[in-house]
Amino acid sequence: MVNIIQPKVDPLPTGIGLTGKTVVITGASAGMGLEATKQLLRLRASTVILAVRNVAKGEACATSLRQDRRIQTHNPKPTIKVMELDVDDYHSVQRFSKQLREEIPVVHILILNAGIGLLKLERSASGHDRTTQVNYYSNVLLIAELLPYLQAGAEKTGSPARISWVGSRAHEVTSLEKKAPIKPGEGVLAHMDKEEAFVPFQRYGDSKLLCVMFMYNLAPRLDPKKVIINMMCPGMVNTNMSDVLPMHLRLIVNVVKSFRARPVEVGGWIILNSALVVGPESHGKFLNDKTISDKSAFIKSPAGQEIQKKLWEETINEIGTLTTLPAELK
C-alpha cells in the first residue's frame, strides 16, 4: 500500500565534517546525484569525484559547483574532479576503476547513485537488458573492481570505507513473484534478458531487487571494520527520472509528483544519511528513508531465497569473466 503523503524527513544532523575526505558519486550531474554532491561540498568534503557518462555536462556541473556561493562559504577550495563512467558499458566501468585507482590515493566513500528506469526492453553492448545493466551488473563490476582498493584505503586511514547504494522500495513488489516468475531450471540472468519477462512498470523495481539481493549476499563476506555497505530508498523525489516516459504518462506522473514527491534536497539528505551518518549497524541493511527495514516478504520466502542464491552464483560467474575477483566474491 502506497502512502499518499510521504513521511517527513529531518535534515542531516549538525557537526558532520568531511575535511580530508574523498567521495565518489556516480550519476553526479543531475537530480539527486547533483544535489548530494552539493551537500557533500557544503559539508567540506576535500575531494569529490563526479563519475558521469557525459564528461562535458560533468565539467559544466563542476564549474557551477565551484561558483556556488553556499559551497564557497563553507568549502572555498575543494577539489572537484570529473571522470567518465558510463554504467551502460562494462568497459567504461573498468576504465573508470583503473583511472580512479591510479589517480586517487584513497576513497573514503563510494555512492552508487546512477540508475535508469526504461519502459521497454533495450539491449546494452553486453547483450543484457539495459535497465538491469545500468542498475545492477555494472554496479557489481564496479564493486568488484574497487573493493580491494577501498579495503587498502581503510587500512591506511584506520576507518572503514563506505559503499552506499541507491535502491528502491519498489523491489518489494516484484514481477518475479507472479507476473513473470522464473521457471524451474531457468537462470535468473537469462530470465531478466527475455522479452516476455519484461514487465514495463516493474522492471526498475525488479532490477533493484537484484541489487538488494546481491548486497544481502555480499555483506556477510565483508569485514565492516574495513568496508560498510548499505542501500537506501529516498522515496519519490522531484527529479527528471520521469522524462523517459511517454508524454501522456509523464503528465500523470508529474501531477502525482506535484503533491507527493519530496524536494531533491530531502533526497540528498537520505542518501547522505546512509553514506555518512548511520554506522556499522547499517552494514548489509536496506533503509527506507532513514529507517533500517526488514527484508521483503518475497526475499524471505523459499522462492526468493532460491533466486538470491542462484543470482549470486550466476553474477559471480559473469563478473569473473571480466575481472579478477577479490576473495570476498569467490
From Swiss-Prot:
Primary enzyme class: oxidoreductase
Pathway: Secondary metabolite biosynthesis; terpenoid biosynthesis
Alphabetical list of Pfam families matching this protein: adh_short (PF00106)
Keyword Oxidoreductase listed: yes
EC id: 1.1.1.-
Domain of life per record: Eukaryota
Designated name of the protein: Short chain dehydrogenase macD
Source organism of the structure: Penicillium terrestre
